[in-house]
């Protein structure tokens, strides 16, 4: 009798974990912008990745305690002009763009609206380490917050700890 109860409990916990992961992948956790209250837009969202469902669950219960640990990172993993590793960054409409050197950064800053087309977005989450455990993230375990526009998304990115408590 005890083993059946344990198996049942294990199955139930497995299903609940799947629901958490699927709900996180399905879309943002909010339907109103945290800053303006307007309807959210798909293109103005940010995702935080986690190493496991356990850390994701802890974050969901108390996001304010962990969001400060999320380090903003460039949305690209290689310089859009040279293809080299990133060493310098510039801000563009609330996003951080990575460049191999200040020369490429300067070229981008002179013509950002044209050169942004060369940026290949590699990062789906704003972090590459779990904000709770510090381990590498599992891209399937994310917490997505959406915004009505890139302006609000940029404000959130500058001070996420201030705004994350507004997520319902």
Describe each PLM feature range.
Residues 1-2:
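N-terminal hydrophobic targeting signals that begin at the initiator methionine
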Residues 5-6, 10, 20-168:
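Intrinsically disordered, low-complexity terminal tails/loops enriched in metal-binding residues
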């Amino acid at each position: 009798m005890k083993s059946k109860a344990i198996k049942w409990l294990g199955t139930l916990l497995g299903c609940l974990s799947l629901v958490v992961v699927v709900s996180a992948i399905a879309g943002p956790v909010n339907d109103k912008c945290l800053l303006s209250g307007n309807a959210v837009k798909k293109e103005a969202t940010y995702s935080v990745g986690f190493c496991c469902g356990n850390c994701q669950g802890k974050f969901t219960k108390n996001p304010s305690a962990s969001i400060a640990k999320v380090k903003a990172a460039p949305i690209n993993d290689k310089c859009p002009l040279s293809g080299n590793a990133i060493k310098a960054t510039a801000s563009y409409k609330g996003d951080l763009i990575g460049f191999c050197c200040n020369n490429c950064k300067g070229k981008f800053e002179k013509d950002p609206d044209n050169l942004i087309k060369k940026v290949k977005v590699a990062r789906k989450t704003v972090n590459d380490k779990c904000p709770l455990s510090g381990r590498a993230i599992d891209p399937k375990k994310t917490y997505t917050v959406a915004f009505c526009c890139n302006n609000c998304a940029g404000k959130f990115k500058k001070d996420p700890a201030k705004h994350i408590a507004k997520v319902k």
